[in-house]
Regions:
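Helix-breaking motifs and short loop linkers at transmembrane-helix boundaries and internal kinks
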Residues: 59, 91, 112-118, 146, ...
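Cytoplasmic helix-loop-helix junction between adjacent transmembrane helices
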Residues: 122-159
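Paired small-residue
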Residues: 106, 117-125, 319-327
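Extracytoplasmic
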Residues: 28-62, 249-254, 370
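Conserved MFS/SLC helix-loop-helix module at the cytosolic interface between two early adjacent transmembrane helices
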Residues: 78-116
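C-terminal transmembrane helical hairpin of 12-TM major facilitator-type secondary transporters
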Residues: 289-339
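Helix-loop-helix hairpin linking two adjacent transmembrane segments in secondary transporters
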Residues: 157-201
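Extracytoplasmic gate region of multi-pass secondary transporters
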Residues: 47-48, 227-282
Length: 411
């Protein structure tokens, strides 16, 4: 049954929204998905920006802080694997509304957390919504975007993630200094609630989804048919390793910078510069992907990232550190977002959210590991240079694996 469905998905172009020029509805959907990913970036990175203040207020050890970081990532993993695939059956729209409701509620309630255990619970539950949202936005963007520029638009939509992170970083230093870290969570929760009516009134399922969705076998076994099996393993491995490095950097840069002697405000801005690099790197990667191919552009970016991580220590004590952080954000986030585009291109409509959700979920396992390893390294007394050198290896391996992904499955 699935083989016949897959054949139809590959050959039927009459329902593809991407065979005609961009229409107003396509632009609207892309903007909505970009906004949702901005909120994702805000909700994920807010714990990183508030970590120095929370750690100081509660006297949290580096190891426990790493567990707090990872609790949200565990939730994102569970959401991506078990909730996001439901969008292939019930639709992208209801899942995105549910995700926004979960995120907004738990982010707001985090402002009332009084100890580490409660903080971990709220981070886990909010992570369920974040993991669901990211997979759904990538899937619906792939269905609406024109075929010739699909990779660019998927990458651009996911670029909302670092945009939200940067805006949060820019505002958080002042908000925390004047009103405390709790107020930042309150504002983030309210901002997330505001997107719910936008999703309800303006988000539309694609014609492609409505015609081909709700198959009986939109399940994980569909990702391991002979056509997809090897490429699925390669994609999962590349995402796992990329997320390991990415989430170490996103969560620990402000704290490591603070440990290195920077003021709390400058430490927060160092994380902002990292995410600013992503804002530039993601659309540039999308452009290069349309020109030179997904595999080549992503793989090379990952290899460059590994080199930058390896030589970071050469810039210690120099103002060039901020420049290197910018290009690290450019490379690691540009490449990992490109892997979302690979997943969106690799799997057909009937299993697209399932494929993207599981790929993100496997990546999130690396995202869980990265901050925990960071906590161990910091607890051992390692500084930024030594920690960055350690994480050069997963970026190197991820780059090599990406270059080996079968071109046939993403053509």
């Amino acid at each position: 049954m699935y083989g016949r469905t897959l054949a139809g998905l590959r050959t039927d172009s009459s329902l593809e929204s991407n065979v005609i020029p961009m229409r107003a509805i396509q632009v609207l959907i892309i903007l909505i998905c970009f906004l949702c990913n901005m909120l994702d970036g805000m909700d994920v990175l807010i714990i990183s920006y508030t970590a120095p203040a929370i750690a100081k207020a509660w006297s949290i050890s580096p190891a426990n802080l790493g567990i707090v970081f990872s609790s949200g990532l565990v939730g994102m993993t569970v959401g991506a694997i078990f909730l996001a695939p439901l969008a292939d059956r019930f639709g992208r729209k209801p899942l995105m509304i549910l995700a926004a409701l979960i995120m907004g509620t738990c982010i707001y309630l985090t402002s009332y957390a009084t100890d580490v255990n409660i903080l971990m619970i709220y981070r886990f539950i909010s992570g369920l919504g974040i993991g669901t949202m990211m997979a759904s936005t990538a899937a619906i963007t792939a269905e609406y975007a024109p075929a010739s520029t699909r990779d660019f638009w998927v990458s651009t939509v996911v670029a909302g993630y670092p945009v939200g992170a940067v805006l949060t970083g820019i505002s958080s230093a002042k908000i925390i200094a004047e009103n405390g870290w709790e107020h930042l969570f309150e504002l983030a929760g309210l901002a997330t609630f505001l997107v719910i009516p936008i999703l309800f009134f303006f988000l539309k399922e694609s014609d492609e989804f409505k015609a081909k969705a709700k198959p009986e076998d939109a399940k994980i076994s569909a990702l391991f048919t002979p056509e997809f099996k090897w490429s699925t393993w390669q994609l999962w491995s590349a995402l796992f390793l990329s997320f390991t490095t990415l989430y170490f950097l996103m969560n620990w840069i402000p704290k490591l910078a603070s440990n290195a002697g920077l003021s709390m405000e400058l430490a927060i801005y160092s994380g902002t510069i990292f995410n600013l690099g992503a804002i530039v790197g993601i659309p540039v990667q999308g452009y290069f992907s349309t020109r030179f191919g997904l595999k080549k552009s992503i793989g090379i970016l990952l290899l460059i990232t590994a080199v930058l991580l390896g030589i970071f220590g050469q810039f210690s004590g120099s103002n060039l550190i901020l420049v290197v952080l910018f290009f690290l954000g450019f490379g690691v986030q540009g490449s990992f977002v490109g892997l979302y585009a690979v997943a969106a291109r690799m799997y057909p409509t009937a299993i697209r959210s399932t494929g993207i959700g599981w790929a993100i979920g496997m990546g999130r396992l690396g995202g869980i590991l990265g901050p925990i390893l960071g906590g161990v390294l910091v607890g051992l007394g390692l500084g930024m240079a030594e920690s960055f050198l350690f994480f050069a290896l997963p970026s190197l391996i991820a780059g090599i694996i990406t270059l080996k992904i079968s071109s046939q499955t993403i053509s």
